[in-house]
C-alpha cells in the first residue's frame, strides 16, 4: 500500500501546510433595531490561532455589505475556519454573526479540490440566550488539490501509519493516553505540534486518530509494509524503561532508517530498539538486521525525563514523561526556552547567557557557542587594555596638571576643532563652561547658614540650614534673577527655564521622519483611537502629519493644532462617562468613578494618556483642563485638604468641622470606614485595616482626616488613573515633569485663554498693509468690539487653537518656530477672509467699508470649516 506521504505532481504534500485564498464577497446581515447604515468588517481565524487571524477592511452599507477582498491563509486539510462579521461603533464593536467552515468536508464534497469554490454560509448570533439566524455570508475558496486517500476517514487510518495497540494483559487504553505522539492530518501525517510559519504550536490531535505512542513499558508488534524484508527477524532485547530515555536517543530529529526498526513475525516479540545501540564495530544480536549508522551510534543525551520513540513508518518522535506530552521536535538544550513574539514568530531564549536567537539551538550549536565564548573571554581583557592604552595616560596627566582638580561625577572634558567643551552624562547635555568654575568665580560668599548643592542632574540649589528649607533662588544680593548663573532664579524665569528644559528633552528624544494620522471630522474620536492605539508608542514621538479626509490641507503644524483642540474637546466630553465636571460651578474635569459602565474604559484611559502626552511632547494645547489634584497625581504629589475645597466643597466643610470640633463632646460615633455609591451600588471601604472596629477619637482624628482626604481623591478611580498614567508614560516619561508644579503643568498643557488686546496689537505684523491702513484700523476696531468668546473664535480661526503660550502673542509658534500674528492683503473685496493656521496668517481682502469688513470677518469665523489648497 502506498505510504501516506506519497504525492503526485500538482497534489499538496500531506504533511505540509498550504496556502488557501479566501475571497470575502458580501454579507447580508439581519439588522434589528439598529441604524440603517452600518460600518462592518469580517474577521477570519484558522484553528483559533492568533497568528492566523486576519481582517478585511471596513465597509459601509445597509442591507448588503460588499467587500470583494482576498485573504491568504496557511491551512491544513483538517483546519477549521471561524468567520465573524463585526459592526464598528464609537466605543465598542458589535458581533453581527458567526460562521465556521470545515475544510475536510469541503474537500470531500468537491473531490479533493478547491478551485474557486463558492460557499454561502448562514450567520448565527445570540439573542437573549438563544442562537438565531444572523443573515448570510458569501465567500470563495481557492486552494491546493489534496489526495483524499491520505485523509483519515474517521475510524480508519492508512497502513503506513497504523499505530500499535497495548497488549491484552496491559492496562486498558483510556480516552486520553499517557504519551500521545504527534498525529496525522490530511495534508499529511504531521501533528499540530510541528512549527508553522508565523503560527504557534498545538498539541491537539484529530478525533479520528489513535495514539501510536500509547506504550508504557511493554512494546507491541508493528506491521510495516516498507520493511517486509525484515519480517523474519527478531530482537531479543529487554524493553527500555521510562527512566532511561537518554539511551535510545538519536542526533537531531532525523528519522531512523528501516534497518534500525526490526519487525518480528511473532506478535509477542518486541519490535522497537531498546536499551542501547550497538557499539562501533560490534554487530547487533539480531537476524536480518543491519548496523545502525554513525549518527545513531554517538547520540547526544536527552534531558532528564525525555524518551525517543519511533513510529512504524520510521519517523522519530519524543516523549516528555515530565508533562506527559509528545512532540516531533527534539527537546531544547538545558537552559533554553521557546517563545513567540507578537507577530507569531518563534524565537529561542538562552537563560544561561541571557540572549535570544531566531535559530533553533542544537547540541552542536551550543558547543560551538561555548567554544566561541571561551575564546572571546580570553581576548576581552587584552582588547580592553588595548582600547584604553591612550586614555589612561591622558586622563591621569590632565588630573595631575589641572589646578582645579577632577571634574564632578558624571562629567567629561572633550575637545572639538581645538575648542574645549564639557559633557554632562547625567543629563546628556553639553556646555562650553567648566562646571568646576561655573558660578564660583568672583561671586560673593553665601549668607551664614546657607550651602550650595547640586542635584544628580547637575542643577544647583541652595540649602538654608537656619530654616531647614531648600530653594533654587540664589539668596545673595543681586543674584535673584540668576543672570550670572543661567539657573532658575525668580518664579517667572524659573518657569521659562523649566519649560525649556522640558522642550530640550523632547527634542533630544525625537525620532526622524513623520507619522501620518488620517481622520474624518465626522468620526474623529474613533479614527484617532484606532490609529493611535495601533501604533508603537515611540512612533508617536515622530513629527505629526494630520490628514483630514476630504480636505486638501497640508499639515505644517496648523492642522495638528486644530486636531489636538478638536479631539481633546471630544474625548474629554462628559457625555462619554469617562470624565465628569468637578462641581456645579467648576468645569475642570476629573475621572468619573462610574466609567466602568463602559467595559473598555481602561483602554480608552490608556489612549487618553497617550494623547495628553503627545500634546505636551509636541507642544500643542488641549481645549479643557483637569483639576489641580489630578495634575498633582500626574506629578506623584500628595493632594492636601485645601485641594478638596475646589472639587467637593460639602465634603471639605464636613472634614473641617470634624477638625475644629471635639468629637467626644458632640457624641459622634465615627469609625475608620466610608461608604461610596456607584451606579446604585453601595460599597464600604476601610480607611485602614480593621477600620470598621476602630473608633475616631481626638487622639487619632488627624490620622482619620488624612486617610479620609486620600480616599476622597482616589475613590473608585485607581484603575482608571493607573491606565491613564501608563499610557502617558509610554510616550513621554513622567520623570520629565518632575520640575513643574501642578499650576505650571496646567499652564503648559492648556495655555492661557485670556486675551490682552494691547499685547495682540503690539505683536502683530503686516504684509502689503501698513499699521495706518484703513483696513487694519477697521480690523482692530472690530476686534475691540468683540466679546472674549468671539475673540477666541478669531484666534482659533487664524492659529488653529484658542489658547496662547505663556509668553502671549510674542511667542506664537508657526511651522518653523516662533511666528507672530500676521495680516496679509490677499484677494478681492468679494472674497471671505482666509487663514493659514500653519503660519498664523490671516488673508484680509481690501474691503471698501467698515461694515463690509465686519460682516465678512464674522461670517468667516462662525460659518466656515475645513482646509484646502490654493
Swiss-Prot record:
Reported modifications of this chain: Autoubiquitinated. Ubiquitinated by the SCF(FBXL15) complex, leading to its degradation by the proteasome.
Subcellular location: Nucleus
List of residues that carry Phosphoserine: 211
Catalytic reactions of this protein: S-ubiquitinyl-[E2 ubiquitin-conjugating enzyme]-L-cysteine + [acceptor protein]-L-lysine = [E2 ubiquitin-conjugating enzyme]-L-cysteine + N(6)-ubiquitinyl-[acceptor protein]-L-lysine
Alphabetical list of Pfam families matching this protein: HECT, WW
GO cellular component: cytoplasm; extracellular region; nucleus
EC number: 2.3.2.26
Biased composition (Low complexity): 198-208, 290-300
Residue span, HECT domain: 536-870
Pathway the protein takes part in: Protein modification; protein ubiquitination
Keywords, sorted A to Z: Nucleus, Phosphoprotein, Repeat, Transferase, Ubl conjugation, Ubl conjugation pathway
UniProt region (Disordered), positions on chain: 150-300
Annotated active site: 838
Gene3D superfamilies assigned: 2.20.70.10, C2 domain, Hect, E3 ligase catalytic domain, Hect, E3 ligase catalytic domains
Description of activity control: Activated by NDFIP1- and NDFIP2-binding.
Residues in coiled coil: none
GO molecular function terms attached to this record: potassium channel inhibitor activity; RNA polymerase II-specific DNA-binding transcription factor binding; transcription regulator inhibitor activity; transmembrane transporter binding; ubiquitin protein ligase activity; ubiquitin-protein transferase activity
Name of the protein described by the UniProt record: NEDD4-like E3 ubiquitin-protein ligase WWP2
Protein source organism: Mus musculus
Gene: Wwp2
